[in-house]
Amino acid sequence: MNKIVTIEGMMCEKCAKHAHDALSALGANVRVELNENKAYLTETTLTDEQIKLAIDQAGYTVTQIVNG
């Protein structure tokens, strides 16, 4: 399943990389777009809770997850 995750708190490219690395560590195929404050996960089996926890532990906040 594909997911679009809106992330609050990313301010720079280093922040985006940190969020990317947090999701990649869980095995996600992810692309993070700083200017959109979004992470795009493709063909993921991660639950919304797993995503939220990883982003929270990285120091950011998930404000929305859209399945699609």
Where on the chain are the PLM-derived regions?
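Flexible metal-binding regulatory segments at protein termini and peripheral loops
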Residues: 1-68
